[in-house]
Amino acid sequence: MLKQSNERRWSLSYKPWSTPETEDVPNTGSNQHRRSICSLGARTGSQASIAPQWTEGNYNYYIEEDEDCGEEGEDWKDDLAEENQKAECLTSLLDGHNDTPAQMSTLKVNVGGHSYLLECCELANYPKTRLGRLATSTTRRGQLGLCDDYEAQTDEYFFDRDPAVFQLIYNFYTSGVLLVRDELCPRSFLEELGYWGVRLKYTPRCCRICFEERRDELSEQLKIQRELRAQAQAEEAEELFRDMRFYGPQRQRLWNLMEKPFSSVAAKAMGVATNLFVLISVVALALNTVEEMQHQAEQGTGGGDPRPILEHVEMLCVAFFTLEFLLRLASTPNLQRFARSALNLVDLVAILPFYLQLLLECFTSEDQRHNKDSPREHDLETVGRVGKVGQVLRIMRLMRIFRILKLARHSTGLRAFGFTLRQCYQQVGCLMLFITMGIFSFSAAVYSVEHDVPGTNFTSILHAWWWAAVSISTVGYGDMYPETHLGRLFAFLCIAFGIILNGMPISILYNKFSDYYSKLKAYEYTAIRRERGKVNFMQRATKKMAECLSESHAQSTTRQEN
């Protein structure tokens, strides 16, 4: 019983409420209530059961027996205040007329310029929906609060909603099944369902599965875009600096200097200096391990500072990194977010080993001076303590290699790689689990067939772990290999398992990395363009060029006059 019209209703005219003069709806008098719900039988299809809940006058109301009637089933109650306000606005134009609607068998609605005729008995099957409440309402005030507008002459209720989605709602009222189209936006569709009060549970299982998959995929994509946008932009909002009472504007300028390289020329120079000091520190760390450099440092030259030049370079780099970390710490408006940042943790790890090394060296020198004149029995204890301190110092020096991670603050690729690992932690975890299971299984199998071979290297399962790890990774150093036929069969299976295992997640990780990298690069480019717009580099260059041209023109004019 569908009736649609493509004519748009451009003007809304409010006319006195009168009984519609139609052939389908007889006039039964103004004081007579219209029966919205007729005697209803059992539902068919998805309308499983209807249980009578209460009776008011001559009208029988039915409540759906929902399984999950929680907050979602009571959401329509939150709109009562807005509906009452809308009803008061429309009722004020209908003062002096009867508040009791006439009895009707059909309901005429206009949604987005398209007209529909619906049976009231069909709408009454779903009294919790908006149209069901409209059909079962016994007062004009209640009906006017449920629609956007009403035309009394044609007895038509107007709704400013999407007609494409309402076509599915109309089919739901007539057939009892809510279908979902793939071209509809999941969020818009859910918003329309929430407005009309229709539950998603009325959709078929096939449509619901596809819809939930698209909704979850959309939510995941939006979440990833928000995280990537947050990484591309500054970590702190500018509104946090405005509410500060303690040097708010100064701290904001300092934060822009440290976190926004394209906000000013000084910020760009600061970013370049940070990367330069990181590279110098890494090169100095590598040169410090060269034997010739150590030999020259031990010989030294008499009468000067015994420290080699590489140690001075190290101290200079640590001083710069310390100053940078303190400036970031002093300018941040949110200490908790600053402490949770992985890049700030990398900055702390870059400078902490140097100060711990100085502290341990101070304790070692004091211990040596204290035990200089001690008896001989304390010499072994002192040597052991110094040896342990030396091992700790070597570990501390090795931790300086983590300074290379400071480049991630200004490297889009490194940040995209870290973001990929965080998003794919489940796939990476499964990969590590499969590798561990393969190492344990194949090492035990090879040990069981190779441990009796004379001169074998598979003396225990622990020794076979190295062979299994090298074989699964398809590296194959050749330092350990099975000699029996059964052992070689296990080796072949181990290598084949490693090839299959390593090939599965590579494509997934690469596709996600390339996707995240391109999106992060786009967000960074947008942020850079915005920051450069604030700095106005082109305006400055144009102004400088105009000044130079004006000066040259003035000089040429002066020469011509002379």
From Swiss-Prot:
Extracellular topological intervals: 185-269, 366-391, 449-461, 483-488
Intramembrane stretches listed in the entry: 462-482
Gene Ontology biological process: protein homooligomerization
Chain spans, region Disordered: 1-34
Keyword Glycoprotein: yes
Topology with respect to the bilayer: Multi-pass membrane protein
Keywords: Cell membrane, Glycoprotein, Ion channel, Ion transport, Membrane, Potassium, Potassium channel, Potassium transport, Transmembrane, Transmembrane helix, Transport, Voltage-gated channel
Domain note: The segment S4 is probably the voltage-sensor and is characterized by a series of positively charged amino acids at every third position.
UniProt similarity note: Belongs to the potassium channel family. V (TC 1.A.1.2) subfamily. Kv8.2/KCNV2 sub-subfamily.
The protein's name in its UniProt record: Potassium voltage-gated channel subfamily V member 2
Organism: Mus musculus
